[in-house]
Amino acid sequence: MSRFFAASDSSSEESSEEELYSDNEASAQEDSDKDSDDDDSDDDDSSSGSEAGGANRFLKDADSDSESEDEDQNKVLKSAKDKRFDELEATIRLIENAQRINDWAVISDQFDKLNRQAPTLMKQNDGKVPKLYIQAIADLETVVLETHEKQKVTPKKMNAVNTRGFNAVRQKVKKHNREFQKDIDLYRENKDEFMRETEEVEAAPKEKKKKSKIPQLGTEIVDEATDDGFITVGAGGKAVQYTPEGILKHLRAIVEQRGRKNSDKLEHIRTLEKLFDVSVNDYQRIRVLLTLISTRFDLTSGTASHMHQDQWKLADQEFGKLLEILENTKEIVVIENAEEWEDDDKLPPIEEGQIFRIPGSVVSFVERLDDELTRSLQHIDPHTAEYVERLTDEALLYAQLVRALIYVESLKKNASLELPQESLNRVVMRRLEHVYFKPSQVVTIMEANSWKAVPETLDSEVTPRAISNDTTSLVQTLSTYLFQNSEGIIRARAMLCQIYFLALHDQYYKARDMMLMSHLQETISNFDVNTQILFNRALVQVGLCAFRAGLVYESQNSLQEICGSNRQKELLAQGLQMQRYSQISPEQERLERQRQLPFHMHINLELLECVYLTCSMLLEIPLLAQLGSSPDLRKRVISKTYRRLLEYHERQIFTGPPENTRDHVMQASKALSAGEWKKAAEFINSIKIWELVADSEKIKEMLSAQIQEEGLRTYLFTYAPYYDTLAVSTLASMFELSERKVSAVVSKMISHEELAAALDQVNSAIIFRKGVELSRLQTLALSLSDKASGLIESNEKTLEQRTQGTANAFERQGGRGGRGGGRGRGGGRGGGVPRGGRNQQFTGGALGRAIQA
């Protein structure tokens, strides 16, 4: 408060206060004049410094009010350099206060003022940039980046003044900080080391400073360095000691500051690492590790989209240490439903034969490690060496999953702990989700490496060491355990994982029966989005398995729902496929990106499309040939997507050589419909994507056999009206099939009433029946009648829509109602005299407008 607004009414107090101010200002001005004789150009700065010095009197913390009387009695004269440093600190405090209330207009003004103060301080500091200034501009840049990222993720409306201020600060910081980038990088590498002044550590304090009533986080000030505990020299030459006796207090202070704004998480981590080094018993180590791992996970709560690899590996190592201590310390357990020890001054009494509970969750830690690894893989370019290097960390995570499962099993055995079954189910589910999509050889290697990291004395009851070499038994055991001990989403996901695994390993009939018996296709819409994605993946894998087994119809039927929608990427969570008229909010887009699967879990979409189009070709070409003689089949469409592509291809005047998968399939379709099965087989087998499939030569042989058979069917559908009899041997030589195979195909067509013929087995010939197939004239007549009936229905619907609501068009108020209610057009008894002054003619109503139209 200014002296002109003193609260006292006494004139004597006012006069004495004015004298005190004048004395202070005079002495400060004299000192400023003495110290700045060689710097005449800074007169304005010195005057502003004296004014700021007066203002700084009222910027002191609240805890210094009780000591104001002592300070007034012991005034210390400050040099111009100290005053300018005080001004710098005051400006930085104003910037920090404005950051707390998100006032970017004030930050912009104070940042300009800060930059004006820096050159003067650099001159007085022998050209060195003040470290306090570097700290301020580096922290401000971090806040600007965090705010900008938050605006991207969750846009929050700023007012116009704030928006202008934020944009101005952003541009200024970006441009200005380039000059000090080297110092900023040094500061960010190690903040404590950068801010530590060696001169201050060696020199004795020149003036007596007040003691803060608020102790610093996790530190104890000692006069001399001792051999007990961990001692660090902090800013100002003060020794900071960490002792075993103060560990619980430090942990309490760190936990209380978690989640607060502007808390230094890296400083907390360094403190916790030192506390772990000085801990002397297992209880302290467990408590420190629980807090340390949680604090590492807090690093990703800011602008970082995923946890850095170094931090992740440190968290993984600390989680391994935690499990090792818990495995060797049977009297201490970490469990979620435990009560926290409140007394920070002494350790809890842990007696032999009793179990002491510490609140925490091993399951949550391993789940968070899994989530952070997945999020990291989502953000790394999959075509770089960095992705492959990061993928190797999955082996470390899988080993931790196995150890966590063994530990949770040991807790489950003790009935007094009352561990919920859900905790064990979550670990088993995570382990199953890491093996269901991998080939057996990869899973076997992962299992072997994981069990090497587990002590020989430990074993799992759910998945013993004995079955680690048998991947099929492992997946079966994990799935069966979840079937028996879980329900809802976890049970459904376990079933889908097993279906996927069976289909991946060419066990089609088991996977199909399990899919049908689960009835998930009826209830999958009630599950969450991630489970629906897993259902789509399992369905697609079943379709691919059917294709590898040569079951074309079953494969096309399984892939139809996914591949026929043109949304394969979205349905399989392998990317965003923006539709032309779709409107998706930024929040929805962010959620969609979070659901994306890492690249190594993707199903090859090009292979998927190739399989779908090939199966559709083998089914649609014979059907299209059959339509010419069977009008009842005209409305039957197996694949609309394939029909649309085929029609587009046929409309092209000139078709060049095939370039991609679709071109190969379309030209093969054209050749197959013309009876050139060899050419069709060449087009299909020349598709390069088949090389990515296991046993590609076997797949190509299967496709050639399928094309031969469907080519035979297409030929018979097309040319049956032109034959009376046809020798089986002729067809066998034409399509390079055995006579037995030709007879089997023809018999099947006759039994399904697809072909009006009889098979003469004595003469080995096909006898076609005449009069059953429609002639060309009859086909055209039926087509004309169908079009005429469709035109009539369309006209009737149009008339009905236009005359809708005209049932009361002729009713008049006071009339007899109905069409015959009045005499003539005017209605009423008064002849043609209009009523109410309105001449409403026949053509004026809704029906009249319809007739006019």
From Swiss-Prot:
Protein name as catalogued: Eukaryotic translation initiation factor 3 subunit C
GO biological process, one term: translational initiation
Species classification: Eukaryota, Fungi, Dikarya, Ascomycota, Pezizomycotina
Gene: NIP1
HAMAP family associated with the record: eIF3c
Stretches for region Disordered: 1-78, 798-853
Residues in PCI domain copies: 599-773
Physiological role: Component of the eukaryotic translation initiation factor 3 (eIF-3) complex, which is involved in protein synthesis of a specialized repertoire of mRNAs and, together with other initiation factors, stimulates binding of mRNA and methionyl-tRNAi to the 40S ribosome. The eIF-3 complex specifically targets and initiates translation of a subset of mRNAs involved in cell proliferation.
Composition-biased stretches (Acidic residues): 11-46
GO molecular function term, any single one: translation initiation factor activity
Pfam families in the record: eIF-3c_N, PCI
